[in-house]
Structures are given as structure tokens and as C-alpha cells.
């Protein structure tokens, strides 16, 4: 293959077809339509196949990005899928929801001169082709004679479960809700991540022999100690996420019509409240909705409210648009669909309509001061700038905290924020119990949670004697990938009992 240069590759990033905003804003069908084969091949021709692979180093799970893209260009889609699934069994999910613009695409060499290679779109394309073709990637597995429990079936739990199953362990995943998937199932709407895609990716895990046990709340039905001492699990991974909603503690939060984005999305996505009364779960959304926050969850909540029939939906955020933590694509989609944005606006009180309902949101205008610990400029109140926004529903999407159930019912040591404390191997204060993902770090991305799950699996294999003890190990955030040094990203030497 002739060496590619910036001048020799297609200069423009291949666009992806999207449904018209006015059409899609009233239904839950997926917004982005994905690449065709010809579009994917054309975009693959923009990759320079850099020898230092900055995109691979920026991926929390170490996907061989040039490898899978090269095979797309050769139209070997099954080979491309096999390369992807060496490191992730969720390509159709990650291609849709990972923030590639601040990870792999953010360091793409092409992006220094042109728009970066659309790595996420290409990953989604291959994942979708695999689902449509019924492909699966099942390695030769030698039974290790060990049982492993995974608590939580979100991204961290699924990644850990997959690696432990590949190592020959009999893996049982315990899920509190009635369906597996964690935040992929209850936290992300169908128009961004269809349930059918989640179902298909989970089916890939079941083909590895992984068992999902739903409607089982560890910490209530069983303790972590019981899993090991009484149920025969040799090791346990806790990846339950951090789903307890955060509020502002301002007057009026107890009024009818105030809800967290977590509850809104869970009712709509998991319990299918949007199909009420055909489904049993109702959800009360008024004509005018104010959503507080500007992250991805806030964007999802606003766009869901539109689809539930709200006539006006507004975003209220105390910083400017430039500081909004939402992905650029999600913010763009929300703007296209008619969301109103009140930047530099901070709620101070929810107004009572006299009947314990909401009639408005009193806010104070802000201006940006000096940078705070996050590196963003701190919002400072502007004296005498209060305004009242008319609304009958207020949705809070300002972050989450750790669910306290596990910490209250076992000997787990927690940190000062209420998250599970772990050492550098992600081991907890209970022997044989490991933890990772949002329940350790606080809210993060899907791919970061998957990276934590893989890193924990590597540590669990060492703990169980299934991996060589001299495998190089790297701390999270270092040059290594999911617990192995960079040079070990393709595989680690493993032995079976």
C-alpha cells in the first residue's frame, strides 16, 4: 500500500445521514442512520496508519484502531469485527455513545490539519454489520474450574465479565433491574442507543457462557461476603455505577413536577413509560419543561421531554455554551430539535403554583470569573439579575452520587465521597472483591467504565492465579491500557488451572 499523506487522503470527513430534526423530535427512532459500505470505505481511506498509534493510546480499552480501519478499506468486515472484538464486545454501543472527540479522535494525526478520521462512526458501522449478520466472536476457552460473580451489568460489569469468561471462569452477572445493560439500558434513550443494539451486544456475552441473574439486589438479597463464603464464588467484581441523583437543595424541590433526570430516563427507557397506558408506568411531563444542567444526561432528558409531548423545553446552565460538558454532537442535535438554552443562568428557587405544583423557576444570571479546580471559569452571580422562567416541570441533571446500599450492608471501605475505596489493583477492603467504574471514580464515560472493568479483570486473574504475576501493570491514567503496559495491549500471557 502506498504511504498516505495529509495531501493524498480525502480531505473532507464523510458525513453520516441523519433524520430531519422536525421529524425525529416527536418519536424515539434513532437519529443517526449510520454509514453505507461505500461511505465507510471512503472514510477508512483517510486513516494515515500512524506508526506511533496515538489513537490506540487514547482508547481506554486499547482497541487496535488502525487494524480494524485497514480491514474496512479492504472490505473485510468480518476481519475488522474480529480485530475490534479482541478488545471490546460492544462495538455497536461504543461507536454510538463514546466521546471519541476527546479520546481517539481527539489525538488523531489527521485532526491536526483536517477533521479527524471518524473512528466512532466506523466502529459503529462494523458493529451494526456484525449484528445484522449474526456474527459472534467466541475464542477457544479452556474451563478454569472457578466461579466469578459480577455485580452490575453496565459497561464496567460487562467488560469484566467478558474477560473473565474468556479466561475460563464461570461468570454470573447480578443485576438489580429486570433487564441487563445498566446505564446503557436505563440511562440512554432509544434515539441515541436503540434497545435492540444493547440486546444484541448482550447476546454476544451470553454466547461466551455468561449467565445474567436479574431482579437481584446485592446488598439486600445477598451480601458480598455471602457470594464468596456461601455461594462459592472465587472472586467478585462490583460495577454498580453511581445512580443516586443529585439535587441543588434550593427551595421548592419537594413540589410536584420536580424530578431527577435519572428517574425520568429510567421510567422512559427501562419501564417504557412513554407507552403509558399500554404500559403500567406513568410519567408526568408538563407543557413547559426546564432541565437544569448541560451534560449528556441533560441533553437526553430534554430531548425525551420533547418526544413525550412537551411544547417548550429549556436548558438552564450556570456556565456558558463553551463550558457545557455534553458531547458536541448531542448539543448540536438538541439545538436542531428546538431546545431553548439559557446560558449563564443558575436556579435559586422553584416557584409554587399554590397547589404544591410548579409554576416557574427563579434564576440568577451569572458571569464567568477565574478558573476553578475543573479548569473551567467559575460562574459568579450578577447582583440584581434575577429572572423567572415559566415552567410546570423541572428536571435536575446535575450529576449523581454513589448508591449507598452496598456500603451500608457490607464491610466495604468507602472514601470520603461515599464511593468504594480500592487500591492500585482495584481490590477493595474485602478479600477477593474488586470494584471499578463509576462506583469508584464517580460519573465517567461508557468506555472509561469498560476500561476499568477490563483492568479489574486483569487484577482478578492475577489474584486467582490465571495470569502470570510478572505481566507488566500500569496504573489507571498512565501510559498503559486497562492494567497492562502499552506493549502488552494485544494479549497477556495466561495460564489455566
Label each PLM-derived region with a short phrase.
Residues 1-35, 336-338, 346-359, 369, ...:
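Mid-to-C-terminal Rossmann-like scaffold of FAD/NAD(P)H-dependent oxidoreductases
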Residues 439-464:
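A conserved FAD-binding loop/helix module that cradles the flavin
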Residues 170-173, 177-212, 302-349, 470-485:
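Rossmann-like dinucleotide-binding cores of NAD(P)H-dependent redox enzymes
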Residues 68, 92-94, 101-151, 167, ...:
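FAD-binding core/adjacent interface of flavoenzyme oxidoreductases
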Residues 36, 207-229, 277-281, 344-392:
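A structured beta-alpha segment of the ubiquitous adenosine-cofactor-binding alpha/beta core
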Residues 146-172, 298-306:
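N-terminal Rossmann-like FAD-binding beta1-loop-alpha1 element of flavoenzymes
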Residues 24-43, 63-96, 113-142, 268, ...:
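Ferredoxin-type iron-sulfur electron-transfer modules in oxidoreductases and energy-metabolism complexes
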Residues 254-286, 371-443:
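FAD-site-proximal beta/loop scaffold in flavoenzymes
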Amino acid at each position: 500500500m502506498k504511504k498516505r499523506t495529509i495531501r493524498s487522503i480525502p480531505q473532507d470527513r464523510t458525513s453520516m445521514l441523519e433524520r430531519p430534526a422536525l421529524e425525529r423530535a416527536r418519536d424515539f427512532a434513532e437519529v443517526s442512520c449510520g454509514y453505507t459500505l461505500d461511505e465507510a470505505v471512503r472514510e477508512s481511506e483517510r486513516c494515515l496508519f500512524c506508526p506511533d498509534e496515538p489513537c490506540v493510546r487514547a482508547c481506554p480499552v486499547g482497541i487496535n484502531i488502525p487494524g480494524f480501519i485497514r480491514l474496512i478499506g479492504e472490505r473485510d468486515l468480518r476481519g475488522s469485527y474480529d480485530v475490534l472484538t479482541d478488545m471490546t464486545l460492544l462495538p455497536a454501543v461504543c461507536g454510538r455513545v463514546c466521546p471519541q472527540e476527546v479520546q481517539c479522535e481527539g489525538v488523531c494525526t489527521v485532526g491536526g490539519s483536517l477533521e479527524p478520521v471518524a473512528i466512532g462512526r466506523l466502529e459503529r458501522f462494523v458493529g451494526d454489520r456484525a449484528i445484522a449478520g449474526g456474527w459472534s466472536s467466541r475464542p477457544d476457552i479452556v474451563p478454569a474450574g472457578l466461579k466469578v460473580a459480577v455485580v452490575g451489568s453496565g459497561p464496567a460489569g460487562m467488560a469484566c465479565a467478558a474477560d473473565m469468561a474468556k479466561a475460563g471462569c464461570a461468570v454470573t452477572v447480578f443485576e438489580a433491574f429486570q433487564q441487563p445493560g445498566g446505564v446503557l439500558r436505563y440511562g440512554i434513550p432509544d434515539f441515541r442507543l436503540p434497545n435492540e443494539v444493547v440486546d444484541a451486544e448482550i447476546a454476544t456475552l451470553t454466547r461466551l457462557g455468561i449467565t445474567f441473574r436479574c431482579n437481584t439486589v446485592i446488598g439486600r438479597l445477598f451480601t458480598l461476603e455471602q457470594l464468596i463464603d456461601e455461594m462459592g464464588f472465587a472472586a467478585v467484581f462490583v460495577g454498580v455505577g453511581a445512580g443516586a441523583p443529585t439535587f441543588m437543595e434550593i427551595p421548592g424541590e419537594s413540589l410536584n413536577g420536580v424530578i431527577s433526570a435519572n428517574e425520568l430516563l429510567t421510567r422512559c427507557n427501562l419501564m417504557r413509560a412513554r407507552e403509558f397506558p399500554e404500559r403500567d408506568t406513568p410519567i408526568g411531563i408538563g407543557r413547559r419543561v426546564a432541565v437544569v444542567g448541560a451534560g449528556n444526561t441533560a441533553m437526553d432528558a430534554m430531548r425525551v421531554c420533547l418526544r413525550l409531548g412537551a411544547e417548550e423545553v429549556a436548558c438552564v446552565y450556570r456556565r456558558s455554551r463553551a463550558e457545557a460538558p455534553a458531547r458536541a454532537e448531542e448539543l448540536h442535535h438538541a439545538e436542531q430539535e428546538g431546545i431553548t438554552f439559557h446560558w449563564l443562568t443558575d436556579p435559586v428557587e422553584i416557584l409554587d403554583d399554590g397547589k404544591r405544583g410548579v409554576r416557574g423557576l427563579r434564576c440568577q444570571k451569572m458571569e464567568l470569573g477565574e478558573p476553578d479546580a475543573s479548569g473551567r471559569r467559575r460562574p459568579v452571580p450578577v447582583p440584581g439579575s434575577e429572572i423567572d422562567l415559566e415552567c410546570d416541570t423541572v428536571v435536575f441533571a446535575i450529576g449523581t452520587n454513589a448508591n449507598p446500599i452496598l456500603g451500608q450492608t457490607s464491610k466495604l471501605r468507602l472514601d470520603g465521597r461515599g464511593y468504594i475505596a480500592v487500591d492500585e489493583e482495584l481490590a477493595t477492603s474485602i478479600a477477593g472483591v474488586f470494584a471499578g467504574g463509576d462506583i469508584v471514580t464517580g460519573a465517567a464515560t461508557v468506555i472509561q467504565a469498560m476500561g476499568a472493568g477490563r483492568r479489574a479483570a486483569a487484577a482478578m486473574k492475577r489474584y486467582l492465579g490465571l495470569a502470570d504475576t510478572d505481566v507488566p501493570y500500569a496504573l489507571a491514567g498512565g501510559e498503559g491500557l486497562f492494567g497492562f503496559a502499552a506493549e502488552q495491549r494485544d494479549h497477556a500471557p495466561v495460564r489455566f488451572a
